[in-house]
A protein has these predicted regions:
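A short beta-loop-alpha structural element at the N-terminal edge
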Residues: 12-24
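Helix-loop element at the rim of GNAT/NAT acetyltransferase active sites that forms part
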Residues: 16, 27-38
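A short helix-loop-beta-strand connector motif used in the catalytic cores of GNAT acetyltransferases and
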Residues: 34-50, 67, 142-145
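Conserved beta-strand in the GNAT
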Residues: 46, 52-60, 65-72
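Conserved acetyl-CoA-binding loop-helix of GNAT-fold acetyltransferases
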Residues: 79-92
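Conserved GNAT acetyl-CoA-binding A-motif
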Residues: 92-105
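Conserved active-site alpha-helix within GNAT-family acetyltransferase domains
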Residues: 104-132
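Acidic/histidine-enriched, glycine/proline-rich intrinsically disordered or flexible terminal extensions
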Residues: 132-156
Length: 156
């Protein structure tokens, strides 16, 4: 799949998650070593391929903003454009200013391609300062490479 296209492989479909997906979502999120504690299936979109959950991502709602989070592609389905498709799809679904935090320069570069730019904790809306501020504390104390990013509308 071309990064600029919005087409999924023919054997895949995107849909809102259902309560039956939570176990598979948790498994995917856990496999990526992401925090599995803030998973509300109602906020997730999933890509199902050949009857199995191949990717997931969520839009978490905060006061006046949203966070793109928990975006994971199953190992067997990587390098087929599912992460790019889901990122673009979630950007289109967002109804408020959109933020994310990611680990490592590689992920930050990935999100930059979709119009996200790095921002500091001081630039964050109040509703995200505490949550993302904790990540920045971990970055400082434990040298964890956390990047906070904001989507700049019109960059897609």
């Amino acid at each position: 799949m071309n990064e600029n296209s919005l087409e999924l492989p023919s054997e895949c479909a995107i849909r809102p998650a259902s309560a039956q997906d939570i176990k598979s979502i948790r498994k995917l999120v856990w496999s990526a070593r992401l925090d599995p504690t803030q998973l509300r299936w109602e906020q997730f979109w999933v890509i199902e391929c050949e009857g199995k959950l191949a990717a997931c991502g969520q839009l978490r709602n905060f006061a006046g903003v949203q966070e793109l989070g928990s975006l994971v592609v199953a190992k067997d389905w990587r390098d087929r454009g599912l992460g790019s498709y889901l990122t673009k799809y979630l950007i289109q679904q967002a109804t408020e200013p959109l933020y994310l935090e990611c680990l490592g320069k590689r992920l930050a570069s990935f999100y930059t391609r979709f119009g996200f730019v790095e921002v500091s904790v001081q630039e964050l809306p109040q509703s995200l300062k505490f949550k993302f501020g904790l990540s920045q504390l971990a970055k400082t104390l434990f040298k964890i490479p956390v990047t906070i990013m904001q989507y700049q509308a019109g960059c897609l």
